[in-house]
């Protein structure tokens, strides 16, 4: 083989080798680029999902907050309504008790309150406290009470109490006290009324 042919063959081999290397490089770069593209695309998809999920969570939280505020507002309104009803009922009861003081049966009612109070007292010397209205009635019934109650010395406080009605009985030391007033009466029924209103209003 002459020199020119030999050179031509070598040249061809070099070109073919270069082309092969070029194809290999291109193929590797292509694979690398495709992998990078797929990775980028996956990251983009993940980011998009994160953003969508974040918006969903925020939307859910806002919805829950709105619902919670609405429920709280409704409960507050119902609670206010119940308090209004309770206040109105107690006021009406107080007015009726006040009117009852002028009823013919109030004399016996007051006498019974005093007797009930004395029956739970352990002291043999008690002080009876009343308002000015009931004090006048008590002066009319105290002799009857003294005859009906044994072994108890009854003393009547001269200074009238600032109460709606009823009686407060205490021993001389003020350690034992029994309150049978309109106020304590209303306080006792207040809880029962509130429970009943709660079941109907809330």
From Swiss-Prot:
What is any one GO biological process for this UniProt entry?
proton motive force-driven plasma membrane ATP synthesis
Q: Which UniProt keywords apply?
A: ATP synthesis, Hydrogen ion transport, Ion transport, Transport
Entry-linked SUPFAM superfamilies: V-type ATPase subunit E-like
List the Gene Ontology MF annotations in alphabetical order. Answer: ATP binding; proton-transporting ATP synthase activity, rotational mechanism; proton-transporting ATPase activity, rotational mechanism
Keyword Transport carried by entry: yes
Give Gene Ontology CC terms: proton-transporting two-sector ATPase complex, catalytic domain
Name the Pfam families on file: vATP-synt_E
Q: Which InterPro entries match?
A: ATPase_E_C, ATPase_V1_Esu
* Main function: Produces ATP from ADP in the presence of a proton gradient across the membrane.
Report the sequence similarity comment from the record: Belongs to the V-ATPase E subunit family.
Q: How is this protein named in the record?
A: V-type proton ATPase subunit E
- What is the organism field in this record? Halothermothrix orenii (strain H 168 / OCM 544 / DSM 9562)
């Amino acid at each position: 083989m002459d020199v020119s042919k030999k050179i031509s063959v070598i040249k061809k081999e070099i070109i073919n080798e270069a082309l092969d290397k070029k194809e290999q490089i291109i193929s590797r770069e292509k694979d690398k680029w495709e992998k990078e593209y797929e990775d980028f695309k996956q990251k983009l998809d993940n980011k998009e999902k994160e953003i969508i999920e974040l918006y969903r969570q925020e939307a859910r939280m806002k919805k829950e907050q709105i619902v919670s505020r609405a429920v709280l507002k409704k409960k507050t309104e119902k609670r206010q309504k119940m308090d209004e009803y309770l206040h109105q009922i107690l006021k009406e009861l107080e007015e009726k008790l006040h009117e009852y003081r002028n009823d013919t049966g109030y004399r016996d009612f007051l006498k019974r309150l005093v007797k009930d109070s004395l029956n739970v007292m352990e002291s043999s010397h008690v002080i009876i406290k009343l308002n000015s209205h009931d004090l006048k009635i008590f002066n009319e019934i105290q002799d009857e009470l003294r005859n009906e109650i044994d072994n108890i010395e009854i003393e009547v406080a001269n200074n009238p109490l600032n109460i709606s009605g009823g009686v407060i009985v205490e021993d001389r030391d003020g350690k034992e006290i029994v309150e049978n007033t309109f106020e304590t009466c209303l306080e006792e029924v207040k809880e029962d009324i509130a429970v009943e209103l709660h079941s109907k209003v809330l």
